[in-house]
Design a protein with these regions (language model features):
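Loop-helix junctions at membrane interfaces
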Residues: 1-183
């Protein structure tokens, strides 16, 4: 429990350190808050990784400007990422299993991001910003992105996959160095 709490707190702090990507609409942000959840999923199993995703989003809720819908989507996508990674690693501990599970998780997270944004996030956002304005933000970068689905497939899906892979890379660089310390907490 202590390790889950500690990793959740780190994930929350990392969630607060989000930043914009120049080639994306300004409302799409990058953070590395899935990193502690992925580490937790490897160290303690997929349930712990999922709990870390849940706690960081619950902690972020009072500061949210999305009415909770962004946190719901972040939780769903984070769980889609850490569950397969943790399951693969739990079944057969090793770098290859961790890599395969992480790749499956990153692909699943990116595919689910399209559905999550299409059916949950953007319909709620249209209460504050017309759909036309949302699509126009994408069209500034790529004029051919003329429907929400095209925007999500062209921009959000690869962005989400890349975000997942960055988390995987960092995890692979640090996991062995910190895993022994985590066990003793």
């Amino acid at each position: 429990m202590t390790m889950t709490a500690m990793l959740s707190a780190i994930a929350f702090v990392l969630m607060m350190l989000e930043f914009s990507i120049p080639i994306m609409p300004s409302f799409i942000k990058l953070d590395f808050s899935e990193l502690p959840a992925l580490i937790g999923s490897f160290a303690m199993g997929p349930l712990s990784g999922t709990v870390i995703c849940l706690i960081k989003n619950l902690l972020h809720l009072p500061m949210s400007s999305t009415g909770g819908v962004g946190e719901l989507s972040n939780f769903i996508l984070g769980a889609m990422f850490v569950i397969p990674a943790g399951l693969f690693y739990k079944k057969r501990k090793g770098r290859k299993s961790a890599l395969i599970g992480s790749l499956v998780g990153a692909v699943l997270m990116s595919v689910v991001s399209v559905a999550s944004n299409y059916f949950i996030v953007y319909p709620v956002y249209t209460a504050f910003m017309p759909m036309e304005a949302i699509i126009n933000a994408y069209q500034v970068i790529l004029p051919q992105a003329d429907t929400l689905l095209k925007c999500l497939v062209i921009f959000n899906m690869p962005f989400t996959f890349a975000k997942g892979m960055m988390n995987v890379l960092i995890t692979f660089l640090v996991y062995k160095h910190i895993s022994l310390s985590l066990i003793h907490i």
